[in-house]
């Protein structure tokens, strides 16, 4: 568990913790990211630009260069430094094929930095003017659901090894996501028992399970399966649909509550 989570109060809601522990200027976590970066880096301006672009969802070198205005050589230097410090993760699409270096993407690997550079750093003057509670209501809350959606995808990928453990799967595996010219898969698990799991994540309300399953089926058809592995299909969702539809054979469905149960051992 990251040390900063110890500052959160389990008796408070997520909103209350963010207001009192992160957005309040007097809180310990309010300046923690700045202290961390000042201790590790010099000339923070370009690093701030890169981290803010990553927090906004930019991930490819081309996107990051365009967003930050930093030339390729300088961008690579700053990204490599952030990767070495453990703040940023270098990622490649997961499949049976050897990934090309041109397919690399980057993501903020630290949850506090990801939130801080998404909501706090770009809006510091506004948040200071509004105060923590009103700042949350006007700056954070309108974008929070979309932000949680991306966090949910990450949680699903991190939960797949625990699902394998509970299902008695002992074959070696790698877990990640896949992106290509015409398909993006949220969760991929490539196992050495000639099995590959492909998963779709849905944070918003699911009105039709068959429709979501059909979207996943289309991604299964487009996913490069060079070794002709058996494909397992998984749907990850915040909660089950209000109306239970027909049982879909060959499909595993996991809700947020299921994933919490894995983490807590419940």
What do these predicted ranges mean?
Residues 4-184:
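Accessory nucleic acid-recognition modules appended to NTPase machines
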Residues 95-96, 205, 240-242:
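Conserved nucleotide-binding/hydrolysis micro-motifs of P-loop NTPases
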Residues 119, 186, 209-210, 245-247:
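Short, well-ordered secondary-structure micro-motifs
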Residues 125-127, 168-172, 184-185, 195-199, ...:
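Extended hydrophobic-aromatic, low-complexity segments
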Residues 160, 185-205, 216, 233:
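Conserved catalytic cores of phosphodiester-cleaving nucleases, focusing on short active-site segments
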Residues 204-222:
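Mg2+/Mn2+-dependent nuclease catalytic core
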Residues 229-266:
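Domain-level recognition of nuclease-like catalytic cores that cleave nucleotide substrates
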